[in-house]
Amino acid sequence: MRLSRPAIRRLLGSLLTILLLGTLGVGLARSLSHVPLSSFAPQSTAVSAQSGELLRLTLAADGQYRLWVDLERMPSRLPAAVLLYEDRWFYLHPGVNPVALARAMFEAGVGRRRVGASTITMQLARRMYRLNTRDPRGKLRQMALALWLEARYSKHDILEAYLNLAPYGRNVEGVGAASLVYFATPAAHLSVPQVMTLAVIPQNPRERRLRSGDANSRKLADGLEEARARLWARWVKAVPDDARFSAAVAAPISARPPEQLPFAAPHFTDALLRSAAGEVQSTLDLARQRTVERILTKYIEGESQLGIRNAGALLLEVGGGVATVRAYVGSADYRDARIDGQVNAVTAKRSPGSALKPFIYGLALDQGLLHPRTILKDAPTAFGPFSPENFDGRFMGPIAAEDALIRSRNVPAVAVASQLSRPTLYEFLQVGGVSRLKSERHYGLALALGGGEVSMEELGRLYALLLNGGRLPAIRSILSQEPMTGGVRLLSEESSFIVLDMLSKNPRPDTGAPASPAVAWKTGTSWGFHDAWSVAVFGRYVLLVWIGNFDNTGNPAFVGVQAAAPLLFRIIDALRAQGLAAGDLVRRFPASVARIEVCAASGDLPNPACPQTVSTWYIPGKSPIRLSTLHRYVYFDAANHRVCGPGPEVRQEVYEFWTSDMLRLFREAGMPRRTPPADPDCGNGSEPGGSDSEALHIVSPLRGLVYTERALHPAPLALRADVGAATHAVYWFAGNAFIGRAPAGETLPWLPQQSGRYTLRAVDDRGGADTRELEVELVP
């Protein structure tokens, strides 16, 4: 179309007016504050692995892939190539190139081929303000806005904004997004052929689409290659040294379409996207992530006949006071709606079952309640209205603390938890970052067995403190996060070390022997078989595995040691086989921890009568250590009558002096212990030993607890005392009121009639006595 001379004159007049006003407005515009050009369009978020490999690129709010990249982070050839191809006079014109504009008008006036006159700034104005530049008014507005932009922003900012908003085909805008979408690399790492390719696409993004493999794209790809060849010819003339790249530029270039963008570690990226934006380089190790995903998927497929359909896993690397996320699997299949696959097992609140027991023992170590070989009682016990049972329904009698932990015995754990104070287990969890806890009274001692809920991330952080010397580490999932040091101390270094040592003796489920290299691990099974857990500390890593259903459907197969532990060790073995988690358990050796020989049967310092000793860790000045009184010498004359001491023709034998309830447990287990013949003149045995274990001790109700009962349907309180083997009966009193008589080692039920404080007194038939203060609260 040819323009008439009057039309040309009017257009030139308008252009001169725009140029004049633009020049006059420069001073004013420069003095005004302005918003960054990066804020004119919504941005995508790119989440990458620690290696820089893209995990996920989100769409911006307007449905475009757009990722802002500073000009300094682009290869220097890219802006230079774009200016060479699009706007050689960019640094000289004020936003509108009068020479190019006049030439374009002349060519249009004489009816020749249309010649572009848009500068980089004009193209930026069109992109920013969505202008229709096909009609003269739109074109005039574009030029006015270009002058305005030049007046307000530097050439650096304008060029940077153009490269971040330029069209690259489909819904891809800007160099940052185009480099990730098409070439799977950050803009800073673009090769010379890739730079030359991206430099020519914005001029005609429809005709110069990157080859994506579809049958109709060949012609479009040819148009792109021709444009790139023209640019390269100009480039080599301008930069002769780059002629060495000519073969690479001439070679076919491969690119992926947006449909093939990665969608890796979806639960992990979902979690990051809630708080992060822009370019986010995470701490995720893609090799470890893929290994964990592969093993987990294969395990679920193999166990599907048991109804095991879903699982999650979290791998943390502990060091420098932080727990760094290395692998993160929120479900067996993110896209499977049948298992609610988009629910995140790492952040979901679930019952941990017995997985909190190591911290009960850790607190007890710090509070001087036990050492690993302290003998605990695994026997029927009522803690007020709470009467825990073991998973197998059986009781083992006397058991060492470390064995009770490894075998996950419930009654000893609850008994130890009942003795904790400042902090209690509840206070430990509260300070340890477990969120949404109800009141301590709501849980009571059931918290020790999984009565509360934790997330996998929260539980992993607690186990990570065992590797961090007892200090609670921060969870780190973004590489740029400043490492936090000096986290709150929840356990001592000594306690953390000993707990890991105890857990490392837990035998693998497949071999029946402790793992080598060492793995300190624990399982958990929630009530109703809703959750199966397994947690391991190995090398400098913490690995957590959960199996269950998000709809809370129970399954008898959901047992920690049977369902979760095999998956746990398959992952550990695979990581070690690939060299991704090699090495023995990394533990700090506190100088104040020592080894000591104790009597194997009692856990106390061995007296001369103790037949067998074992070595254990203890914390000097804190661990309870006393001389054992379990084994004692008993003397017999030639006629096999008991005598009270050594003498001519007197032999000595060693007897174990267990309390009455323990003797009963041994009998019920089919392992009765022999008891020495009674002789009132000889007391309870001869030194070494003494008679402490023969004294009467009230063991139920517990000291310091408030017993709350329903007034209409109260449950009887269990009254029980430990007595010596020679005791036959125990008599119970509430104040001066007689309650009843119980055989030695047996429980007497008692129903208080009103709320208040009671003084309970137990007296045995040999004169032994003990008292216990008790508070009872009857509620409607």
Predicted feature residues:
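Soluble, non-transmembrane domains of envelope/secretory-pathway proteins that act on or interact
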Residues: 7, 245-261, 519-780
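Conserved catalytic neighborhood of penicillin-recognizing serine enzymes
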Residues: 107-134, 261-274, 370-425, 468, ...
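Non-catalytic, structured segments within soluble enzyme domains
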Residues: 25-26, 113, 117-294, 329, ...
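A short, well-structured edge-of-sheet supersecondary motif
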Residues: 44-57, 74, 306-338, 432, ...
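N-terminal type II signal-anchor transmembrane helix
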Residues: 1-50
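A penicillin-recognizing enzyme superfamily signal
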Residues: 282-305, 313-317, 328-331, 336-345, ...
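Short, well-structured active-site flanking segments
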Residues: 91-100, 173-176, 339-342, 365-383, ...
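Active-site SXXK
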Residues: 81-83, 87, 235, 292, ...
